[in-house]
Each structure stands twice: as structure tokens, then as C-alpha cells.
């Protein structure tokens, strides 16, 4: 990278500053003709490539991007009037470049608005005054004590009444539970009695069935004997008839 060349006129800014003594630095006016001629010489001698080189070295935009030095600025036209003199402070403020963070807008005045309501008193009023205003007819201490005793008595009566009602309801619930348990026990005993009766009836039927089986077997044996006897008698009769026929 080639080294950037800076004009000596840029480095030497003494031509832009007014030459005045120490006691006249704050109040003495400057010759407007000499200041205007020095600014014209600076604008004619300085070229744009040198400002571009300075901008590349500094890495930030310079005044070369915003000001055209080839034409005379109309904002400085009042400097051509020889009757107008400016102090050094006014000239410094005139030619100073505002920084990036500086605000270009005028700071608003902080005068109080005429429509703003006056500030209210933030001190809280006295507690006694509030109580007296809230209760204009305050009751004595004895009446409040009696009233609280009445409230306690009514509350006690209310609780006793509902305690009694809850006690009666609990007694009824327990009695109902006892009655239900007794009913279930009675039904259980009835079912047990019926079960035992059915078991006895079943055993009796089983016994009668066994007796009927035995009686049936006895009748079968008798019937077989009678059949055999009748068959033997019939055979005997047939034998006698055969003997008679052979004679």
C-alpha cells in the first residue's frame, strides 16, 4: 500500500486561527477581510484527492464528502461585510464541526408549562383528622364494648344452635346406620334359616329316594319269582298233557 501524502496546509491550521494577543483572545474582533482571504486561499490550494487520502487514513468520513471547496459558500456571505466584527469565541463556535454524538436539534426549554396543574401536597393528612371526618358521630368506648359483647353472645348462640342441629343430625345418621345393620343381620339370619330348611328337605328327599329304590328292587325280585313259578307250572301242565296223549 502506497503511503498517503498529506498537504502541509492541512497539517498547519494556523492560517485558520486568528492571531491575537493573550489579553485580546476572548473579546477582540478579527478582521473579516483577512479571514475571508485566508479561507479562499485554503480552498484554492487544497485539492479533493488529498482529502480522500486523509479519509482513507483516518477510516471515517471527513468534511471532504460534505463541503465543496471549489465554490464560495453562501452561508459565509455575511463575512464580506466589513462593518461586522466577530469575537474569537463566536468564530470558534461558527467553524467547529459537531461530533457524531452531538445532537443537531436544539434542546427543548425546560420552562414549566402554563397548563400544568400545581403539585399536590404529598404529606399524608393526620390520622385523627381522617377518623373524625369519616365518623362524625363517634360512639363512646363503653358502647363499643357492649356492642362487641352482644356480637359475641349472638355468635355463641348461633354456634350452639347449629352445633345442636349437627348433633341431632349425627344421632339420626347413627340410628339409621344401626337400623340398616340390624335389617341386614335379620335378612342374613332369614337366609341362613331357609338354607338349613332346604338342606333338611334335600336330605329327606334323598332318603325317600333310597327307600323307593329298595322297594323297587324288592318288587322286581318278587315279579321274577312269580314269572318263574308260572313258567314252571305251565311246563308241568304241558308235560301232563303229553303223558295223557301217549297213553
UniProtKB/Swiss-Prot annotation:
Q: Where is this region: Basic motif?
A: 156-196
Q: Which PROSITE patterns match?
A: BZIP, BZIP_BASIC
Q: Which GO BP terms sit in this record?
A: ochratoxin A biosynthetic process
- Compositionally skewed regions (Low complexity) per UniProt: 23-47
Q: Note down the stretches annotated as region Leucine-zipper.
A: 198-212
Q: Where is this region: Disordered?
A: 1-48, 100-143
Q: How is it used?
A: Stilbenes such as resveratrol, piceatannol and pterostilbene affect the expression of the OTA cluster to reduce ochratoxin A and B production and thus could be used as naturally safe and efficient compounds in food active packaging or preservatives against ochratoxin A in food. Pterostilbene with methoxy groups demonstrated greater inhibitory and antitoxic activity than resveratrol and piceatannol.
Q: Where is the bZIP domain?
A: 156-219
Q: What induces it?
A: Stilbenes such as resveratrol, piceatannol and pterostilbene downregulate the expression of the ochratoxin cluster.
Q: Which compartments does it reside in? A: Nucleus
**Which regions are flagged for Polar residues bias?**
134-143
Q: Function, please?
A: Transcription factor; part of the gene cluster that mediates the biosynthesis of ochratoxin A (OTA), a mycotoxin demonstrated to have nephrotoxic, immunotoxic, genotoxic, neurotoxic, and teratogenic properties. Positively regulates the expression of the cluster genes otaA, otaB, otaC and otaD, and the subsequent production of OTA.
Q: Which named protein is this?
A: Transcription factor otaR1
Give the species: Aspergillus carbonarius (strain ITEM 5010)
Which gene name does the record give?
Answer: otaR1
Amino acid at each position: 500500500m502506497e503511503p498517503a501524502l498529506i498537504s502541509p496546509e492541512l497539517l498547519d491550521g494556523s492560517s485558520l486561527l486568528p492571531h491575537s494577543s493573550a489579553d485580546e483572545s476572548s473579546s477582540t474582533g478579527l478582521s473579516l477581510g483577512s479571514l475571508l482571504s485566508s479561507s479562499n486561499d485554503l480552498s484554492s490550494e487544497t485539492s479533493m484527492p488529498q482529502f480522500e487520502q486523509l479519509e482513507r487514513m483516518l477510516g471515517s468520513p471527513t468534511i471532504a464528502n460534505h463541503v465543496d471547496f471549489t465554490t464560495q459558500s453562501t452561508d459565509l456571505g455575511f463575512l464580506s461585510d466589513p462593518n461586522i466584527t466577530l469575537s474569537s469565541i463566536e468564530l470558534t463556535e461558527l467553524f467547529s464541526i459537531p461530533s457524531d454524538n452531538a445532537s443537531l436539534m436544539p434542546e427543548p426549554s425546560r420552562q414549566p408549562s402554563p397548563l400544568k396543574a400545581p403539585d399536590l401536597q404529598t404529606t399524608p393528612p393526620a390520622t385523627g383528622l381522617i377518623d373524625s371526618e369519616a365518623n362524625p358521630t363517634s360512639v363512646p368506648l363503653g358502647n363499643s364494648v357492649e356492642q362487641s359483647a352482644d356480637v359475641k353472645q349472638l355468635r355463641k348462640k348461633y354456634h350452639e344452635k347449629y352445633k345442636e342441629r349437627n348433633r341431632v343430625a349425627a344421632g339420626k345418621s347413627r340410628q339409621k346406620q344401626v337400623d340398616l345393620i340390624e335389617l341386614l343381620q335379620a335378612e342374613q339370619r332369614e337366609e341362613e334359616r331357609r338354607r338349613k330348611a332346604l338342606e333338611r328337605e334335600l336330605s329327606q328327599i334323598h332318603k325317600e329316594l333310597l327307600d323307593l329304590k329298595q322297594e323297587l328292587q324288592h318288587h322286581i325280585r318278587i315279579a321274577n319269582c312269580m314269572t318263574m313259578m308260572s313258567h314252571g307250572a305251565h311246563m308241568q301242565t304241558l308235560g301232563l298233557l303229553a303223558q295223557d296223549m301217549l297213553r
